[in-house]
């Protein structure tokens, strides 16, 4: 080194680098340390003390004058520290296992002395033995920095032999097998592959046993193992030997660090878990476990078996052995010694008995139905286990005994068993089993029963006291005639066929199992006799002669039970017993369907399986006679006859005339008191004789008919089409010409000529009471001026109703009470003619015509005729006329008053000329007293009130209903809607399309609360549904049945199953609830033109008798509340459509009761009269009969009484009406009528 390079400077502060001597300057460059001393003496004898991170240098020199020591780092800079007489230097902070070159330079002589030193690697840490076996041990340690490899020294502490293993790489798994030589020292190194292009690769070993013995194998650690650990497995060690393992860490040049050691001892060989298997009387198999884990040295096992009087020795090299030549039921002590070479390990021990010998002569000694005895022989066993198994089953129980015999009890009779016996040694060791089979004796059958018997078959069942299988039952059936039938069954039942009907058999059953037969048992049983056939019945009205046949061979001993039942209800009429094949049954009911059932019986009461039977009917009782009643003003006859005795399904009604013949079946007839039948024959001709026959029908039979000749009544003559001709004769007379009326409704009895000075309105019967005197005094502008009686003229002049008549009016003639007075000059007169088929005179009123009781029709009025001026004195004539008229009026009023008084006493209500009141308002608290007053004397007061209502509204015009095109739309020609209140439909193609027989009716809240209409006709169904749609109807109240008393009262206008179209309206029923008193139906009504629809509910009251009233008031009241509850859900402007047949009687009663309930609840008053009056001003004949009028008052009384009793909520409000009074049956009631009966 040049002097220029030797300069002194302060050393840098570098962590980890310390100087032991402050005057010394240390310079590091790639492991070099330069240290300079003073010249002239050179440096010699350099020594070093090395550790993993430091080097202590010491040296000698002879330069006592050295003033400094310099250490140079030629790569960086030179550092110089003044030193004086220093001969050592401690260098720290070095890296373990690293080679360094140190140079010491003398400053004086510039001479250099170099020294290369490698620091020690760190010693291993965490050295421990992870597992130790008999010949193996596994050691692991943690790697140290700077370690390139490890060397292991293993010493056997007993023999002091050792093995040196080098080349162990950090982080690897190694395996080393100890050599078998007796060398005290051996060295081994890791084997490696030839380096490839990527460097040296260790041998990957997966099966260490495949490597050559004594080789050291190193493999890469498995994935997941800590790479900082190194492991070595030492194999082929000596058992039960102590070893010392010392680990040296080595630098790359072989420099070793401080050693670390671990002393361990291998386990000795040991036998454990010695077991004996497959133990028999003379042998057994032994198994055990060994802890030997080596592979180089073979281990052997020496077995010593000692017991009884001899022992057995055996040597094997595996952990099992078969020991033979042993004695039965002997206790043996077994020892298993392990030997590894000459070294004996820890032995294993076992003490075990051999099995006893198999028993001999195992046999069945005795047998019964419930037990089997067993016996056997054995020489070396004192305990035995017996297993008992039923054939086909599993071992279900076992028994133990110390004897050499055993009785097995509680067995099943007739059952095969399998017995197995096993001897047991003193410790319970089992010997070989022995088996024997045995069967119990079968038991006799019990409870033999005949479960089914027919004419030729017998089904038998019996019981057995056990459930044993394999039974065979032998059956023998023997009859009295000696015939024998044999058969077998494997079940406890059998069906035996080919038997003889009605025969007694002796049945015997023998049980058998495994060809062992048990005790027999027997019963006797008859087969059933055959049913009778060819049943013939001859009947009268009350008897039946019955005969039959039975073709069985044993039929001579048969008896017969004859049962007569009513067909339908099955009630027993009579039961008879006979031994003959015929019988006469008396005291039957005529016209009744009977069932005769004949059971054949034999011996002990065994009967035929099914009876022979036949249906028959007694002859119906004939109708003895009947009488005819004429229906006033109807082309009909009412027929009445005594109800025949017995039952009948109807009657065949024959009606014959000269040109007409009709047979009608009456399903039934109306009976007032169950003693008299009645029916109405309609659609006949007036005033015609008919040959009528009535025959009783029942069960398809018809009795002899009863016959009679009946003549129909008469009615008002047909209204003539033309009007009379009137011409002026003088200033006070005219001439009236007319043709006779048609006589199809009865012979014309009289004609009345009527004059009027008023409007040409259609006259009514009311005008017949007015005379010339009434006209003259101004009481009426219409009067009867002349009367022609056909009977008289017919006798004297031979005139008939087809002739033309000419009457002089004003000739001052008198006919009965009518004066043909002179006419007024300058007057305008019109004439009409009244024709009579029946004319009645009021003898108490000057012989005037009684229009109410006469059958009359009127021609239209003629055109007006004007009279000329009277040339005479007019004033006197006028005065005389007026005076005369007053006198006549007074007399007529007196006569009428007298008649009125008489009629009231006789309860005959007649027409009153007094103008009736419009209202009779009564307070609720006074109504009961009023009701009692009116009810007195057979409802006389109510009759007078009802009579006052008779003609209310009848004069109101009905022109639209009388148009020819509309007449066919009316069900009855006397129930026509008033023009003022009629319901008008939309006009479609014709001006009369707006007509339907219906009126708006006032309710409590509105004048159009209701629509009252007739029951639809087949030709008005479309109009009816058009009205429902156009008038926005949501509820229909129907108060009639479609057919009553055999007459159609209303067409069934609704669909029942599928939707139906009525013009543009489609109707579909969605539900129907049928109850005893009414039926509720729901519909959907849809207009096909605009596809709009709304719901509709029909309340069909079916308990209102024809021509009567409901049986109880609360029935109708609750029905009304049912309707009103529904109306709360629909639009308030929607009217309720109410109809019966004509739409006046029952319809008016329902509407009236609705208004009365509202009046009672809201006003605390009652006005039955006023409400009916109001209804009749909107539609004729509303509340049609007097009984209906009285019924309304009764309803009011019941409501008021219920309110007083605080029961209104219970009876009339919030009622689930569909469940009330469901079991009441309506009773027909008849009463007086006012107008047409609907």
Curated annotation (Swiss-Prot):
Extracellular side: 29-876
Function: Tyrosine phosphatase which dephosphorylates or contributes to the dephosphorylation of CTNND1, FLT3, PDGFRB, MET, KDR, LYN, SRC, MAPK1, MAPK3, EGFR, TJP1, OCLN, PIK3R1 and PIK3R2. Plays a role in cell adhesion, migration, proliferation and differentiation. Has a role in megakaryocytes and platelet formation. Involved in vascular development. May be involved in the mechanism of contact inhibition of cell growth. Regulator of macrophage adhesion and spreading. Positively affects cell-matrix adhesion. Positive regulator of platelet activation and thrombosis.
EC number annotated for this UniProt entry: 3.1.3.48
Location of the Tyrosine-protein phosphatase domain: 942-1199
Positions bound to substrate: 1106, 1140-1146, 1184
Protein name according to UniProt: Receptor-type tyrosine-protein phosphatase eta
GO molecular function term, any single one: protein tyrosine phosphatase activity
Sugar-bearing residue positions: 62, 78, 85, 90, 110, 114, 145, 164, 173, 182, 198, 207, 244, 253, 267, 278, 313, 317, 333, 366, 379, 398, 403, 437, 452, 488, 506, 538, 572, 576, 662, 668, 685, 691, 725, 811, 838
Membrane-spanning parts: 877-897
Entry keyword set: Cell junction, Cell membrane, Cell projection, Glycoprotein, Hydrolase, Membrane, Phosphoprotein, Protein phosphatase, Repeat, Signal, Transmembrane, Transmembrane helix
Similarity annotation: Belongs to the protein-tyrosine phosphatase family. Receptor class 3 subfamily.
Tissue: Expressed at high levels in brain, kidney, spleen and intestine, and at lower levels in liver, lung, thymus and heart. Expressed at a high level in the myeloid cell line FDC-P2, and at a lower level in the pre-B lymphoid cell line WEHI-231 and the T hybridoma cell line HB21.7.31. Not expressed in the fibroblast cell line NIH3T3 or the erythroid cell line F5-5. Expressed in macrophages.
Source species: Mus musculus (Mouse)
Subunit structure: Monomer. Interacts with CTNNB1 (phosphorylated) and JUP (phosphorylated). Interacts with FLT3 (phosphorylated). Interacts with GAB1 and GRB2.
Subcellular location: Cell membrane; Cell projection, Ruffle membrane; Cell junction
Catalyses which reaction(s): O-phospho-L-tyrosyl-[protein] + H2O = L-tyrosyl-[protein] + phosphate
UniProt-annotated catalytic positions: 1140 (phosphocysteine intermediate)
EC top class, as a word: hydrolase
Gene Ontology cellular-component terms listed: cell surface; cell-cell junction; immunological synapse; nuclear body; nucleolus; plasma membrane; ruffle membrane
Gene Ontology biological-process annotations: B cell differentiation; blood coagulation; glucose homeostasis; heart development; negative regulation of cell growth; negative regulation of cell migration; negative regulation of cell population proliferation; negative regulation of epidermal growth factor receptor signaling pathway
Cytoplasmic compartment segments: 898-1238
Signal peptide boundaries: 1-28
């Amino acid at each position: 080194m040049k002097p220029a390079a030797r300069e002194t400077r302060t050393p840098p502060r570098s962590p980890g680098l310390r100087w032991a001597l402050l005057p010394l300057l240390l310079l590091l460059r790639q492991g070099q340390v330069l240290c300079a001393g003073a010249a002239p003496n050179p440096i010699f004898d350099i020594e070093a003390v090395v550790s993993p991170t430091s080097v202590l240098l010491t040296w000698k020199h002879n330069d006592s004058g050295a003033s400094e020591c310099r250490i140079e780092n030629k790569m960086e800079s030179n550092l110089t520290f003044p030193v004086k007489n220093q001969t050592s230097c401690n260098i720290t902070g070095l890296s373990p296992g690293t080679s360094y070159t140190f140079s010491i330079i003398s400053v004086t002589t510039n001479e250099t002395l170099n020294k290369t030193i490698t620091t020690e690697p760190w010693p291993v840490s965490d050295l421990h033995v992870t597992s130790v076996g008999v010949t193996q041990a596994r050691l692991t340690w943690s790697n140290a920095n700077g370690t390139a490899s490890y060397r292991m020294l293993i010493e056997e502490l007993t023999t002091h032999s050792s093995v040196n293993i080098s080349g162990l790489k950090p982080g690897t798994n190694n395996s080393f097998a100890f050599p078998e030589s007796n060398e005290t020292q051996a060295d081994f190194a890791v084997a490696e592959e030839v380096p490839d292009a990527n460097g040296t690769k260790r041998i990957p070993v997966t099966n260490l046993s495949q490597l050559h013995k004594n080789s050291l194998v190193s493999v890469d650690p498995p994935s997941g193992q800590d790479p900082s650990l190194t492991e070595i497995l030492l194999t082929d060690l000596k058992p039960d030997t102590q070893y010392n393992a010392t680990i040296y860490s080595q630098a790359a040049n072989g420099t070793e660090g401080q050693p670390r050691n671990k002393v361990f001892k291998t386990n000795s060989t040991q036998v454990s878990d010695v077991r004996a298997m497959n133990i028999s009387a003379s042998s057994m198999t032994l198994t055990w476990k060994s802890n030997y884990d080596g592979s180089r040295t073979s281990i052997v096992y020496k077995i010593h078996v000692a017991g009884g009087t001899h022992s057995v020795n055996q040597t094997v090299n595996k952990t099992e052995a078969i020991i033979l030549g042993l004695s039965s039921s002997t206790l043996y002590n077994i020892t298993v010694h392990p030997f590894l070479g000459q070294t004996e390990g820890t032995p294993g021990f076992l003490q075990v008995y051999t099995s006893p010998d198999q028993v001999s002569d195992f046999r069945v000694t005795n047998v019964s139905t419930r037990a089997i005895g067993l016996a056997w022989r054995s020489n070396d066993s004192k305990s035995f286990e017996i297993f008992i198994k039923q054939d086909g089953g599993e071992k279900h129980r076992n028994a133990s005994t110390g004897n050499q015999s055993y009785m097995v009890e509680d067995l099943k009779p007739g059952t095969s068993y399998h017995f197995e016996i096993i001897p047991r040694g003193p410790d319970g060791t089992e010997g070989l089993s022995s088996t024997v089979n045995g069967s119990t004796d079968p038991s006799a059958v019990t409870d033999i029963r005949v479960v089914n018997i027919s004419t030729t078959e017998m089904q038998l069942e019996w019981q057995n006291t056990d459930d044993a299988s394999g039974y065979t039952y032998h059956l023998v059936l023997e009859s009295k005639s000696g015939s024998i039938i044999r058969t077998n069954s494997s079940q406890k039942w059998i069906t035996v066929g080919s038997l003889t009907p009605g025969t007694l058999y002796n049945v015997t059953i023998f049980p058998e199992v495994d060809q062992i037969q048990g005790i027999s048992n027997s019963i006797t049983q008859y087969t059933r006799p055959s049913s009778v056939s060819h049943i013939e019945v001859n009947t009268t009205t009350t008897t039946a002669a019955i005969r039959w046949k039975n073709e069985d061979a044993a039929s001579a001993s048969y008896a017969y039970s004859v049962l007569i039942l009513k067909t339908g209800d099955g009630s027993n009429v009579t039961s008879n017993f006979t031994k003959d094949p015929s019988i006469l049954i008396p005291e039957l009911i005529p016209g009744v369907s009977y069932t005769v059932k004949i059971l054949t019986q034999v011996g002990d009461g065994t009967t035929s399986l099914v009876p022979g039977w036949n249906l028959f009917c007694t002859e119906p009782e004939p109708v003895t006679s009947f009488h005819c009643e004429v229906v006033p003003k109807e082309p009909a006859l009412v027929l009445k006859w005594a109800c025949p005795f017995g039952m009948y399904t109807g009657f065949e009604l024959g009606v014959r005339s000269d040109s007409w013949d009709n047979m009608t079946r009456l399903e039934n007839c109306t009976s007032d008191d169950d003693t008299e039948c009645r029916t109405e024959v309609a659609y006949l001709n007036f005033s015609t004789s008919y040959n009528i026959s009535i025959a009783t029908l029942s069960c398809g039979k018809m009795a002899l008919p009863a016959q009679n000749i009946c003549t129909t009544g008469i009615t008002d003559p047909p209204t003539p089409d033309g009007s009379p001709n009137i011409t002026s004769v003088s200033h006070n007379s005219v001439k009236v010409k007319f043709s006779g009326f048609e006589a199809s409704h009865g012979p014309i009895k009289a004609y009345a000529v009527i004059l009027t000075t008023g409007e040409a309105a259609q006259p009514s019967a009311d005008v017949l009471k007015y005379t010339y005197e009434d006209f003259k005094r101004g009481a009426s502008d219409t009067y009867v001026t002349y009367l022609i009686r056909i009977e008289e003229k017919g006798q004297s002049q031979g005139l008939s109703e087809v002739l033309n008549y000419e009457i002089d009016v004003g000739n001052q003639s008198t006919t009965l009470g009518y004066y043909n007075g002179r006419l007024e000059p300058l007057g305008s007169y019109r004439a009409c003619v009244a024709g009579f088929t029946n004319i009645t005179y009021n003898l108490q009123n000057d012989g005037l015509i009684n229009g109410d009781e006469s059958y009359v029709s009127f021609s239209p009025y003629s055109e007006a005729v004007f009279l000329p001026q009277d040339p005479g004195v007019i004033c006197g004539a006028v005065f005389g006329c007026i005076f005369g008229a007053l006198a006549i009026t007074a007399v007529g009023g007196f006569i009428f008053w007298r008649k009125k008084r008489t009629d009231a006493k006789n309860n005959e209500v007649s027409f009153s000329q007094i103008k009736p009141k419009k209202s009779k308002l009564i307070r609720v608290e006074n109504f009961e007293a009023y009701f009692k007053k009116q009810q007195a004397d057979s409802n006389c007061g109510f009759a007078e009130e009802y009579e006052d209502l008779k003609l209310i509204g009848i004069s109101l015009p009905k022109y639209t209903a009388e148009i020819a095109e509309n007449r066919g739309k009316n069900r009855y020609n006397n129930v026509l809607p008033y023009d003022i209140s009629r319901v008008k439909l939309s006009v479609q193609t014709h001006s009369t399309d707006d007509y339907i027989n219906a009126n708006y009716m006032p309710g409590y809240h509105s004048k159009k609360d209701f629509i009252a209409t007739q029951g639809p006709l087949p030709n008005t169904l479309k109009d009816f549904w058009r009205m429902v749609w156009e008038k926005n109807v949501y509820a229909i109240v129907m108060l009639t049945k479609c057919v009553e008393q055999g007459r159609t009262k209303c067409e069934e206008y609704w669909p029942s199953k599928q939707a139906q179209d009525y013009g543009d309206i489609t109707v579909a029923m969605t539900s129907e609830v049928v109850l005893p008193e009414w039926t509720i139906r729901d519909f959907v009504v849809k207009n096909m033109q605009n596809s709009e629809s709304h719901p509709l509910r029909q309340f069909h009251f079916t308990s209102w008798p024809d021509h009567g009233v409901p049986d109880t008031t609360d029935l109708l009241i609750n029905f009304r509340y049912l309707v009103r509850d529904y109306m709360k859900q629909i639009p308030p402007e929607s009217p309720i459509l109410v109809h019966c047949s004509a739409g006046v009687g029952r319809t008016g009663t329902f509407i009236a009761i609705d208004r009365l309930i509202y009046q009672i609840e809201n006003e605390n008053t009652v006005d039955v009269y006023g409400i009916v009056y109001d209804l009749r001003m909107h539609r004729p004949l509303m509340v049609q009969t007097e009984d209906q009028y009285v019924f309304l008052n009764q309803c009011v009384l019941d409501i008021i009484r219920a309110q007083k009793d605080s029961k209104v909520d219970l009876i009339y409000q919030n009622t689930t009406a569909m469940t009330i009074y469901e079991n009441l049956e309506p009773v027909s009631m008849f009463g007086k009528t006012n107008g047409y009966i609907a």
